[in-house]
Design a protein with these regions (language model features):
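N-terminal secretory-pathway/extracellular module detecting exported/lumenal segments
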Residues: 1-157
Length: 157
């Protein structure tokens, strides 16, 4: 019931966040990122590479009242693993919390859900962005995410 619905909601939010990341690389993804109330802004984004796996970690903060929830603040901490040795990406962990920092989704962690990242797919675009030689050095890309996400959601409202 309720917990399953929250998992679904957070997964939907995760896809939107990663769509925003992808829209930094391929502008046509911008249109997919517009779902008001899902997340107000991206608080941080980081890349960490271990061998062939790149972990993209993102934290979003939103005002869930706009989306019909009771909490005043909603923080979602999530990660996506990109396997540069194959065509797979996975959204791996998601934890949501309220303003006090208390976890509101019972410490929600997911097992990696791998799906194929084809050339034109969201995962494929992110994979190209982080797996290309030198991609990890493109720090300005990460620095721009916060302003870019805020602008996307401002336009969406």
């Amino acid at each position: 019931g309720e917990k399953k619905r929250r998992v679904t909601d957070i997964k939907a939010d995760a896809r939107i966040v990663f769509t925003i990341l992808a829209s930094r690389i391929r502008p046509e993804y911008r249109l997919l990122a517009h779902r008001p109330g899902a997340a107000d802004y991206l608080d941080s984004a980081s890349f960490d590479r271990r061998d062939d796996i790149v972990r993209i970690k993102v934290v979003t903060v939103s005002n869930p009242r706009a989306a019909g929830y009771k909490a005043d603040k909603h923080v979602v901490d999530m990660a996506m693993d990109v396997d540069c040795a194959s065509d797979r990406v996975a959204i791996v962990t998601m934890v949501s919390s309220d303003a006090s920092g208390a976890e509101t989704s019972e410490g929600l962690y997911t097992e990696p859900e791998w799906f194929t990242a084809g050339p034109g797919s969201l995962g494929g675009v992110l994979r190209a962005a982080v797996c290309e030689p030198g991609a990890m050095k493109r720090r300005p890309l990460v620095a721009d995410y916060r302003a870019d996400a805020a602008e996307a959601f401002r336009r969406a409202r």
